[in-house]
């Protein structure tokens, strides 16, 4: 019986340690290669995504990945279809994020679930990136 209690306590301690220290690990940003966007362009878009995911209470961001020039160029028309009247974007950029939902008090999230969401951002003539939509693609 004592051995079973020790094993249960060790497992519980392991879970607590993972839960406490996992938030300390910074998210990875995979900028990839691009012939149309500078590293700073990709970083500023990824920063917007990171800030948004980090605002989701209890969620832990693991990675933000640039989906490449071809995907980004191909989605400019889609991004313009999301624009408010009178706005025409000249550039679009697409990322995928990987994050985990809260273990406890998950609310609308599935508890402790891994999410991979697509993010569509656009801008006009080198201006500031705007997040147009995100979620499951």
Language model: regions and residue ranges:
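Flexible low-complexity loop/turn motifs enriched in small/helix-breaking residues
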Residues: 4-113
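Short beta-strand edge/turn micro-motifs at domain boundaries
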Residues: 114-137
